[in-house]
């Protein structure tokens, strides 16, 4: 029959969280590239072809190695360097080029868990996000976009994107040296606008 929506399209306008991402096959992970780029997933089957909306935030989580003990406090990792390389090689460069923020999180100790320090409440974070979205909407008024994630790179890099000449030169130098891909330049600009909106 006709292809039916899967997790990617069910995550439309939400978050697709892949825990232990390197445990997924490289083929499955690379299939995420097209919907991340276009916001649409197209499925071809013998019974027909179907396209579904798939504009989602992708969150990937991974252990530091296959056994999960590398970098841990008092834990002995049993993985070889080759095993670690193979483990992370499933997360291809083109896929990671579509991941805006990458963060390494260290092991949590018992003392960290027992700590009574308080961060921001969910309500406070929600208020900050709402203010940032309103700032983006004001800045993007008169354009077809409401969110920084929706703005195409050509606009971000163009005269209306608000990019100063010195910053533009720095980004183009990073692009020419191979430190950033064109997607990476756009990612930096989107993230910069988001951080500015959060201020």
Residue ranges and their predicted role:
Residues 23:
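ABC ATPase nucleotide-binding domain "signature" loop
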Residues 13, 19-20, 31:
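Walker B catalytic acidic pair
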Residues 2, 26-199:
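Basic, amphipathic alpha-helical bundle interface domains used for macromolecular binding and assembly
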Residues 1-16, 49:
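Conserved alpha-helical scaffold flanking the Walker A/P-loop in AAA+ ATPase domains
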């Amino acid at each position: 029959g006709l292809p039916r929506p899967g997790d990617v399209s069910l995550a439309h306008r939400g978050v697709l969280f892949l825990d232990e991402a390197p445990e997924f096959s490289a083929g499955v992970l690379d299939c995420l590239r097209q919907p991340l780029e276009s916001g649409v997933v197209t499925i071809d089957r013998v019974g027909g072809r179907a396209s579904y909306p798939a504009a989602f935030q992708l969150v990937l989580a991974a252990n530091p190695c296959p056994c999960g003990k590398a970098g841990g406090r008092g834990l002995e990792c049993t993985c070889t360097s080759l095993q670690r390389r193979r483990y992370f090689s499933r997360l291809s460069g083109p896929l990671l080029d579509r991941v805006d923020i990458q963060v390494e999180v260290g092991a949590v100790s018992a003392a960290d868990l027992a700590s009574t320090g308080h961060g921001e409440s969910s309500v406070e974070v929600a208020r900050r996000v709402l203010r940032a979205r309103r700032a983006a909407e004001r800045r993007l008024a008169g354009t077809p976009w409401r969110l920084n994630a929706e703005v195409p790179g050509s606009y971000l890099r163009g005269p209306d994107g608000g990019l100063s000449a010195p910053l533009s030169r720095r980004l183009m130098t990073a692009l020419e040296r191979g430190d950033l891909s064109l997607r990476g330049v756009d990612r930096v600009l989107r993230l910069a606008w988001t951080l500015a909106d959060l201020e």
